Structure formats: structure tokens, C-alpha cells
Amino acid sequence: MPKRKAAGQGDMRQEPKRRSARLSAMLVPVTPEVKPKRTSSSRKMKTKSDMMEENIDTSAQAVAETKQEAVVEEDYNENAKNGEAKITEAPASEKEIVEVKEENIEDATEKGGEKKEAVAAEVKNEEEDQKEDEEDQNEEKGEAGKEDKDEKGEEDGKEDKNGNEKGEDAKEKEDGKKGEDGKGNGEDGKEKGEDEKEEEDRKETGDGKENEDGKEKGDKKEGKDVKVKEDEKEREDGKEDEGGNEEEAGKEKEDLKEEEEGKEEDEIKEDDGKKEEPQSIV
């Protein structure tokens, strides 16, 4: 069996390369760096009076130091002339320090007044700018409201016009219909009136004819009755005269009655025929 070769240095070097290639192929999730938020520390707000006092103290110390330096230089020069090198410091007097403080206070008050004036001017300018902005906004709102009102008024006017037009059209249509209906009714009424007039005329003519026929019939009947009565009287007279001819007289009476009845039937038929003629015309 062949022995395996021990892993040399070359093999040891190749392994990490392979691992690095594999790792490079892998996607590494990128985590964004989270920066710690700065916490706002509570700072003491210095008042104007504190600031004024600090400025006055620092300025007084600076003036006192300059005066001390000037005194030291003079003494040094005098001692140098005399061959001595002693340095003597002249203490600053309290009066000078107080004067310097007062001067610094006056300067600070003047500066503070100027600052106050500047701040007040800035505040006024800001207020004026705000007022102007508000006025501009109000003007824009007013213009927008006016435009909306104008648009609404125009729309309402259009609706009114359309409504009026529709109402006028409806009225015209209704009037036209009524006129047409009235005309039709009038024409129908005229036709009906004419028909009624014709019927009345026909009735009147028929009534007149009937009256005339009735009168004629009455006259005829009266004439017949008179004739019958006269004949009866004559017969009675003849009976009285002739006594024996009663049978003949009775026969004659029967014949006369039959003739009269036949005539009456003929007249009734003629009257019925006359009445039927105007009805057929209607």
C-alpha cells in the first residue's frame, strides 16, 4: 500500500485560498452603522445681568494689568539708569478700578441698548412681514371666494335659463296642445251643432208634416163623420119613408164602414211611410 504523503507547506497555503474564494462568493449582509444620537445636555442659560458683570470684571482686570505693566516698565528703566535691576510693582488703586468698571458698565449699557433696539426692530420687521403675509393670504382667499361665487352665480344663471327655457317650451307645448284640442273641440262642436241643427230642422219639418197630416186627417175624419151622419139621417128619413128597405140600409151602412176603415188604414200607412223617410236621411 502506498503511503500517503504528509501535508506540506504548499497544501497548507492552498486551503485558506479555497476558503477565501468560497467566502467571497457568499453574499455578506451589509448592516448600516447606527450612529448614537447626541443627547441634549441641559445647559444653564446665562442672564443678561450675569453677562454684563463678567464683561465688566474682565475689562477691569485687563485695564489694571496694563497700568501695572506701564509702572513696571518705568521703574525698570529708572533702575537700569542707576545700575540697579529691581522690579517694583505699583498696586492699582481702587478708584481706578471703580472708574474702569463704571466705564465698562456704561459701554455695556450702550451696547445693550443698541442690541435691544436692533432686536425690537427685528421683531417689528417680523411682525410686519407676518401681517403682510396674512393680508396676502386673506386677499387670495377673498379672490378665491369671489371666483367661487362668480362660478356659482354663472351656474345658477345657466340653470335658471335652462329652467326658464324648459318652462317656456312646456308652456308653449301645453298652449299648442290646448289650442289644437280647442280647435278640434270647436270643430267637433261645430259639426255637432250642425248635426243638431239639421236634426232639429228635420224634426220641425217632420212635426210640421205630422201636424199637417194630422190636420188633414182630422179634417178628413170630420168630413167623413159629417157624411156618415148625413147618410144616417137620410137613411133614417128613408127608413121612415120607406119602412121596408131596412135591410138594404143596413148593408149600405156596413159597406160604408168598410170603405171608411180601408181609407183610414191607407192613410195610416202613408203617414208611417212619410215618417220613415226623414229618419233614413238622418
Swiss-Prot record:
Transmembrane segments: none annotated. GO terms for cellular component: chromatin; mitochondrion; nucleoplasm; nucleus. It is found in: Nucleus. InterPro entries: HMGN5, HMGN_fam. Pfam families: HMG14_17. There is a cross-link at K101 (Glycyl lysine isopeptide (Lys-Gly) (interchain with G-Cter in SUMO1)). Ubiquitously expressed. Residues 125-138, 257-270 have a biased composition (Acidic residues). The modification Phosphothreonine is found at T31. SMART domains: HMG17. Coiled coil: none annotated. Preferentially binds to euchromatin and modulates cellular transcription by counteracting linker histone-mediated chromatin compaction. PANTHER family: HIGH MOBILITY GROUP NUCLEOSOME-BINDING DOMAIN-CONTAINING PROTEIN 5, NUCLEOSOMAL BINDING PROTEIN 1. This is High mobility group nucleosome-binding domain-containing protein 5. The lineage of its organism: Eukaryota, Metazoa, Chordata, Craniata, Vertebrata. The gene is HMGN5.
